[in-house]
Swiss-Prot record:
Domain Guanylate kinase-like, residue spans: 10-195
UniProt keyword annotations, A-Z: ATP-binding, Cytoplasm, Kinase, Nucleotide-binding, Transferase
E.C. no: 2.7.4.8
Enzyme class: transferase
Protein name, as recorded: Guanylate kinase
Reaction catalysed by this enzyme: GMP + ATP = GDP + ADP
Origin organism lineage: Bacteria, Bacillati, Mycoplasmatota, Mycoplasmoidales, Metamycoplasmataceae
Length: 201
């Protein structure tokens, strides 16, 4: 899914959907398009880094104790617990990007995306939010993608598929639903939405 928050000094684009649906690949291709003026908002997580993940680029990797301190200090727009790990979106990261007159790109799982919607609803800015939920062509393909990633156990994959089924039921909470049949076609669909919704792009 993708949520775009329209703000005078920049936009927030949130990509969301089940794990393994291709959010990371879509995000990478969007960031390559300089016309979109996108900057990736690096989230905080308590999970261990995967192979080739870089501190400060893919995530800020913190211990559970450090994450808890950030919660107490109200540093997050949203945070959630997923597969026994914490994930959170830092207010400071979003503000820094918007302050530099860029649009913010946030790739986030569904619970976090819904929490962001709640956050901006409280700020009476819900009309400025555009959401896009990325769907898999089939659940079987989603399972294959996660399996090919090689970073989860069979039990973790079962949990992810079960969670994906629940997340897909929430798709109507987002303004747009896109199916990622073919990566480049899906990216073009996202870009077309951005061009329609953000007139200056």
């Amino acid at each position: 899914m993708c949520i775009i928050l329209i703000m005078h000094h920049g936009k927030i684009i949130i990509l969301s959907g089940p794990s393994g649906v291709g959010k990371g690949s879509i995000e990478k291709l969007l960031l390559e398009d300089e016309k979109l003026k996108l900057k990736f908002s690096t989230s905080v997580t308590s999970r261990k880094p995967r192979v080739n993940e870089i501190e400060g680029k893919d995530y800020f990797f913190r211990s559970e104790e450090e994450f808890s301190e950030l919660i107490k200090e109200k540093k997050f727009i949203e945070w959630s617990r997923h597969l026994n790990n914490y994930y959170g979106t830092l207010k400071s990261e979003v503000d820094k990007i918007l302050g530099a007159k860029f649009n913010v790109l946030i790739e986030i799982e569904t619970t976090g995306a819904l929490n962001i919607l709640k956050y901006y609803k409280k700020k009476n800015m819900l009309n400025d939010v555009i959401s896009i939920f990325i769907l898999p062509p089939r659940l079987e393909e989603l399972e294959t993608r996660i399996l090919n990633r090689g970073s989860e156990t069979k039990e973790e994959i079962k949990i992810r598929i079960k969670k994906a089924k629940k997340e897909i039921k929430l798709k109507n909470k987002f303004k747009y639903n896109l199916t990622n049949n073919f990566l480049h076609e899906c990216v073009e669909e996202v870009k077309n939405i951005l061009k329609r919704e953000i007139h200056e792009i």
